[in-house]
């Protein structure tokens, strides 16, 4: 599942100049984006399922 794949855009070793708060904000933004995509996929599947039943 793509939710558990590692993000290759992030460096493997944290930059010492990057603050802990900045890393937390970045991780929170990524999680929020993943949840948004997941919600959209689920809603599309539910809508598709509703339309397929009526046929």
Swiss-Prot record:
Keyword NADP set for record: no
Where in the sequence does glycosylation occur per the annotation? 7
Quote the cellular component terms of the Gene Ontology held in the record.
Answer: plasma membrane
Biological processes annotated in GO: cellular response to hypoxia; negative regulation of cell population proliferation; shoot system development
Q: What does this protein do?
A: Small polypeptide acting as a regulatory molecule which coordinates cellular responses required for differentiation, growth and development, probably by restricting polar cell proliferation in lateral organs and coordinating socket cell recruitment and differentiation at trichome sites.
Topologically, how does it sit relative to the membrane?
Single-pass membrane protein
Keyword annotations from UniProtKB, A to Z: Cell membrane, Developmental protein, Glycoprotein, Membrane, Transmembrane, Transmembrane helix
- What single Pfam family name could you report for this chain, choosing any that match? DVL
Report the sequence similarity comment from the record.
Belongs to the DVL/RTFL small polypeptides family.
UniProt keyword annotation of Membrane present: yes
Task: Name which cysteines form disulfide bonds.
Answer: none
The cross-references to InterPro entries, in alphabetical order and at most eight, read: DVL (IPR012552), DVL_RTFL_regulatory (IPR051525)
Q: What is this protein called?
A: Small polypeptide DEVIL 10
Q: Which residues cross the membrane?
A: 32-48
Region called Required for DVL/RTFL small polypeptide activity, residue ranges:
19-50
Location in the cell reads: Cell membrane
């Amino acid at each position: 599942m793509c939710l558990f794949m590692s993000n290759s855009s992030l460096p493997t070793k944290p930059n010492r100049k990057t603050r802990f708060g900045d890393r937390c904000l970045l991780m929170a933004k990524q999680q929020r984006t993943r949840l948004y995509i997941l919600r959209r996929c689920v809603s599309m599947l539910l809508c598709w399922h509703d339309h397929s039943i009526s046929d």
